[in-house]
């Protein structure tokens, strides 16, 4: 029940979405989770030995950092702990948080690459990846292409590009 208590404690920050405003800039008005609160959740993650609960506390920690006063802590936490987590929906949702933070920091190429990885590896999050992928400049897309590690990531990146820009070119690049 402690997990539910911690998850519920985040709702003021995570469920902020004024029904009268569809613009995302109102996010800055939402309640931010205090770093001290996130540290309590992280401590629980570190102390948990059950693998199922550990994954749940890991994701809860990521979510709390994402909605916290300092989102950079989410990236640091992900980079130091993600290798211990199975690459399932929790992992890729957390990775999409990292991609979102990179987007807000104007790291467009990195963010787009990360959303392509989510798109490729987690079908349940494909809609989220499509909606958050933002091909803005050709140079950003070319930078994203330089980051791919295999043909699957390359195909995912081109598929997302094709959704927003030139589907014929994207298909030709996927199959060549």
Stretch-by-stretch model annotation:
Residues 89-112, 116-117, 166-171:
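Repeat-solenoid scaffold signature
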Residues 42-52, 78-89, 114-124, 141-150, ...:
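Solenoid-like repeat scaffolds
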């Amino acid at each position: 029940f402690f997990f539910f208590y911690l998850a519920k404690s985040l709702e003021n920050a995570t469920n902020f979405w004024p029904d009268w405003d569809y613009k995302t800039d109102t996010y800055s008005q939402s309640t931010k989770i205090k770093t001290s609160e996130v540290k309590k959740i992280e401590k629980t993650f570190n102390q948990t030995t059950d693998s199922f609960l550990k994954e749940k506390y890991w994701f809860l920690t990521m979510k709390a950092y994402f909605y916290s006063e300092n989102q950079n802590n989410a990236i640091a936490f992900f980079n130091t702990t993600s290798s211990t987590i199975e690459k399932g929906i929790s992992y890729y949702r957390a990775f999409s948080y990292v991609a979102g933070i990179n987007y807000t920091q104007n790291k467009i190429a990195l963010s787009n690459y990360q959303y392509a990885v989510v798109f490729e590896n987690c079908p349940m999050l494909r809609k989220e990846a499509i909606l958050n992928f933002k091909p803005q400049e050709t140079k950003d897309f070319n930078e994203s292409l330089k980051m791919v590690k295999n043909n699957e990531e390359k195909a995912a990146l081109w598929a997302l590009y094709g959704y927003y820009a030139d589907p014929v070119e994207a298909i030709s690049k996927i199959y060549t």
